Amino acid sequence: SASQSAKNAKEMAVCWINLFGLQSLQTGEIGEANQREVEFNTFKVVEFVDFCCKQGFLPVVACTPLGCDLNSYVSDAFGDATLGGIERKMKERGVPFLNYRKDERFQSELSLFTDGGYKLSRRGSLKYMKILLADVQSFYETVINNKSLNA
């Protein structure tokens, strides 16, 4: 229900604030310790993407959708403070960073999530994977299907 989704989203936001010692998810101020973790995680993602590129793979970094209730607690400034470094590093490398966090196709359908907008339901996962696959194919200008995957 809509009221349960809103309640779950609020509980998740409060949980994240407490878990990471944040004042809010509405600001880019994440604190020194969290900033170090973000920088370390960014380094690891870049390291992995660079490895994939050297192996001849076509890497993609994606941020999954959040529902509208959960998105109401997370500002763009917070998103930039936590994911912006990865997004910028991928852009430098010509690797797609596909950010579906606020994707309109997921904002008004509660049935796409099993909770307040964080965990995709089976239906939400299928919808997301179809969108992701189409976007990856478009970015790399290649068809991805069972035949191409087994080549």
At which residue positions do the language-model features occur?
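Substrate-gating cap/lid alpha-helix
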Residues: L66-R101
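Active-site segments of SGNH/GDSL-like serine hydrolases
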Residues: V49-D76
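Extracytoplasmic/secreted proteins, especially bacterial periplasmic and envelope-associated proteins
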Residues: F40, K44-E47, A81, G85, ...
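Short helix/strand-capping connector loops at secondary-structure junctions
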Residues: R105-D115
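Secreted/periplasmic serine-hydrolase-like ester/acetyl group-modifying domain
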Residues: S1-K54, S148-A151
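Short loop/turn segments at strand-loop or loop-helix junctions that form parts
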Residues: L19-Q23, A62-L66, Y100-D103
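Second-shell loop/turn segments in exported
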Residues: E32-V38, Y73-D76, T114-K119
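Histidine-centered active-site loop/cap adjacent to the catalytic His
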Residues: F113-N150
